[in-house]
Amino acid sequence: SSVYSNTIYYLTKIPNLKIHDLNSSNGIKYLKAEKSFKVGIVENNVQCNKPSENDIKNKFKIIKKNLERYEKVFLEKINLKYVVLCENLKVADIKTAGVPNHKVKTLIIDIKSDPRYFERSIHHELFHMADDSYDNLFSYDKWEKFNILDFQYAECSTCSNRSDLSLIKDSNGFITEYSMSTASEDMAEVFSFMMTDMDNLSIISQDDSILNNKINFIVSEIQKIDNNFKFK
């Protein structure tokens, strides 16, 4: 009803949404685009299209299963309450798997993003909410000191051509090519593997002290937010 959509708009600042599912164990409210929406300022606008019911049916179980791993207490601390399902998500005309906005407690997920990395991308975007919610944690300066001396990240995640999301077995401090783009993306990539592929990550990091330091850093910072947090 229009009352609901007005309330949803008031809370999330996104138009054209309706409720999809309110029965989560951790308080997340799942919303979906009823028609396409476009929000934000011109050079940084976010746009996304209405998803088909079939696509939602295929992906919703996966999204919910992954997000149900987070306790309500933790989600409240990182300001995540609303998850918006849509497809063909873009920021400033660049395709993206998700858009987190901790100020309105909302994570937008493109349910049609690359299925190979879909589950991992959920945790990747959730990490950005944690990072954005805590200015005093996840120091980029500390993180950059883990890398070899002459390594430099790009100015921003979209101003580099380091975009491959597949696992680098011979890691040398970086788990994917995309993790070489910025410190923030590097952290989110490591966190996403910690949540979805810890077995592989543990094997790789045995021979990679840089990666091992990065994993330990993420554990210690996440535990400062919630010391009961479980990665498994």
State each model region's role.
Residues 4-5, 25, 32, 65, ...:
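Alpha-helical structural elements
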Residues 41-103:
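Auxiliary, metal-adjacent structural segments of Zn-dependent hydrolase domains
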Residues 79-232:
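Active-site-flanking segments in enzyme catalytic domains
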